[in-house]
């Protein structure tokens, strides 16, 4: 059995335990830092954030839909996929130098989160670039293909790998004082990912009150 089949079989076995999968609220991870919700004028100002939403992955052989929770900072990424009933399907805990993936009662480790996901699942998911795209930003290796009538980026192409990733920003929404994507689609060959951000919250260090010691 190849990596993709084994990965999706593990996920669907978890889903079967909790009944039919719907896309609803997400189970969140406990905070691991002293970050607090903040308001920003632009998503580029948010060095950390957390989101709750939906993820759908499609290949010619398989389809997967799950709830997504992601807490991102410059030092750490914590990502969880769950079913509607809160059953945890997958957790990923990554730093710039290490990654730990837990799925189906098994633990996998690597020095790179993107390499780890590809090794276990067979999918080349661009986990390193997603934090930029999720917030509607264009990376240094991204090429803008089209913009909408307001001049906002509509579609970009990233050619770090071949075939390239094509990212389409389907709709936008106001969150935490900034405008971020609501739905986006990622395509690379016959692999398609769809993301929906139901809630996006910018995070930052809490302000020090007058008279308090830092």
Curated annotation (Swiss-Prot):
GO cellular component, as recorded: cell outer membrane
Function: Plays a critical role in the incorporation of lipoproteins in the outer membrane after they are released by the LolA protein.
Residue positions bearing lipid (S-diacylglycerol cysteine): 26
This protein's name: Outer-membrane lipoprotein LolB
Entry's localization field: Cell outer membrane
Highest taxon in the source lineage: Bacteria
Main location (coarse class): membrane
Subunit structure: Monomer.
Lipidation (N-palmitoyl cysteine): 26
Keywords associated with the record: Cell outer membrane, Chaperone, Lipoprotein, Membrane, Palmitate, Protein transport, Signal, Transport
